[in-house]
Every structure is written in C-alpha cells, then in structure tokens.
C-alpha cells in the first residue's frame, strides 16, 4: 500500500514537473515566403532556442527560384551559371534549401516545412499571388495540419505592409486565415518588422485593404528585441553577430549580404484577430527574452 501511494505521488509529481517545464519552453512556428526571410527574426529565434530552450519550426511557402538575379557572386562558389534564368530557376530551389538549413542550424531551427510554391517574380500585388500563382487550398491545408500537430504557442510572420513583397504579404495572410479557421486552441500570431536606432521615420501599419484579418489597432509594436545587447568577455559580443552569421549562409542571394549590420531592433506587432487574451502571453515571453543573455 505504501509503495502504491509513493508511486502515485511520484507519478503526479512527474506530470506537474513536465507541465512546468513545458510552460517555460515556448513552441514557435515561423511562416515566411522565401528561404531567407527568417533573418528578420534571427536574434529573437536564437534567444528562444538557445536561452529559453524553446522549439522553433519554419514553414517556407515558395521555392525561392526567382532569386537568380542576385546570384552573380555565387556562380563561382557553386560553379553554376545561376544568373541565367532557366538555370537559376532549376538549381536555386535546392541550393536555397541547403542555405536555409545551414542558417537554421545557427539559429536552432528544429523542423523545416517546404511548400515549394512558385517564386515567380517580385511584385507588390498579393491578389495575383493568392489567386493565380500559389495553390492556396493546398498551402492552407498543410499549414493547418502543421499548426494542429505542433501545438504552437506563437506564430511569427513578416508584417504585411503595403510596400513589402506580395509574397511576404501572401504568406502572412494565409497564416492569419489558417489560424482564424482553427477550431482548437489558437496560437498567437505576430507580424515582425526591423528598424534602426537612427531611423527618421517609423512604421505605420493598421492593416491591408480587403484583408481584415491583417488589422492592427496598436500604433506601435507590442514588444521589441534589441540586437545590440552586449554580452561575453568585456561585453564585446552582440546578437548582430548571430544575424550576420545567419545572413552569410544565404550565399546565392547577394543582395541579402547588404543587410549585415543593419537593423537594430526586431519589432513584433499584435494582430487584432488574436483578441486581448494573448497579449499577456506575448509580454511574458518577451520579458523572459529581454532578461536572458547567452552565457
């Protein structure tokens, strides 16, 4: 009888302990359009995986084939004529997946989900992307299954401003639509932007016309992560180093390299569709992040 009681107590304590551990380990899904967009959250993701020991997965909607125009410097590296459109579109999807996974290894990404939708060309027109270019039912069905199975607490997307790539807008819109249609517990979905401490203008975003799920009433981000926080020996290290490492892995995308040392803050915006109940969870997560430093 005594052994049975002890076993029961031990079992209950194990359940409690696991619950406490899981409560402190955030589960995050990133949903982006291209195999380099994750750089917009690089410092935040690194802190979640390395300092809070959380899990971050990544879903990428397109195959990245349209990046051939920026691949000149990568041609001798890969020994492929990547700036030739036909050649670039043939080889870049595989190359960019490998680059992304190398970058993700730095950030601590756990699982990758590639949707392989066409990366046709740069456009601001999200309507054409959603109506013509991508297989939207397939994307939403797979996103739904990934979110349901992953039991995520948060989803990170890029803030879908008017001036951003139509593919970026599309990826965020589909994530918002998928979350809104969930019958089970919904993760909090956030839109991210970057800014510099010397910026003379600030982001103003309240939503995209014809896409009410993108509505944001707040006039400023709910929270930000400072890439310039210093740590290590004589405080000589910052999270910008991690961001630069991550960017450097995307060698086929020459224009990406120009973002090194740019962007001081990763800003996260709260979509109205989350309701107010998720705000406290967001603030708790980022309070932990802003009080944690890698050691």
At which residue positions do the language-model features occur?
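Sec-dependent N-terminal signal peptides
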Residues: 4-14
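Active-site rim/loop-helix segments in enzyme catalytic domains that contact anionic ligands
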Residues: 20-150, 177
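Sec/Tat signal peptide C-region and signal peptidase I cleavage site
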Residues: 15-19
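Metal-dependent de-N-acetylase/amidase catalytic core
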Residues: 2-3, 20-31, 128-132, 136-295
């Amino acid at each position: 009888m005594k052994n049975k009681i002890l076993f029961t107590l031990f079992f209950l304590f194990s359940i409690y302990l696991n619950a406490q551990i899981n409560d402190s380990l955030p589960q995050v899904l990133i949903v982006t359009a291209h195999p380099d967009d994750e750089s917009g959250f690089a410092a935040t993701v690194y802190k979640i995986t390395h300092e809070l020991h959380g899990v971050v997965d990544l879903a990428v909607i397109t195959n990245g084939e349209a990046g051939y125009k920026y691949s000149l410097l990568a041609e001798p590296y890969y020994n492929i004529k990547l700036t030739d459109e036909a050649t670039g579109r043939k080889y870049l999807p595989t190359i960019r997946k490998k680059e992304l996974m190398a970058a993700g290894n730095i950030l601590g990404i756990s699982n990758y989900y590639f949707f392989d939708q066409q990366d046709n060309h740069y456009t601001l027109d999200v309507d054409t992307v959603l109506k013509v270019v991508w297989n939207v039912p397939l994307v939403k069905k797979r996103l739904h299954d990934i979110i349901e199975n992953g039991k995520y607490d948060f989803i990170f997307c890029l803030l879908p401003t008017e001036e951003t790539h139509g593919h970026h807008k599309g990826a965020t819109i589909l994530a918002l639509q998928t979350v809104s249609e969930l019958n089970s517990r919904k993760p909090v979905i956030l839109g991210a932007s970057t800014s510099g401490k010397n910026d003379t203008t600030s982001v103003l975003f309240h939503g995209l016309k014809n896409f009410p799920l993108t509505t944001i009433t707040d006039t400023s981000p709910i929270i930000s992560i400072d890439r310039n926080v210093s740590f290590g020996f004589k405080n000589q290290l910052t999270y910008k180093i991690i961001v630069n490492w991550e960017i450097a892995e995307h060698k086929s995308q020459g224009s990406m390299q120009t973002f090194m040392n740019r962007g001081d803050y990763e800003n996260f915006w709260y979509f109205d569709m989350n309701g107010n109940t998720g705000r406290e969870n967001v603030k708790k997560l980022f309070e932990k992040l802003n009080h944690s430093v890698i050691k």
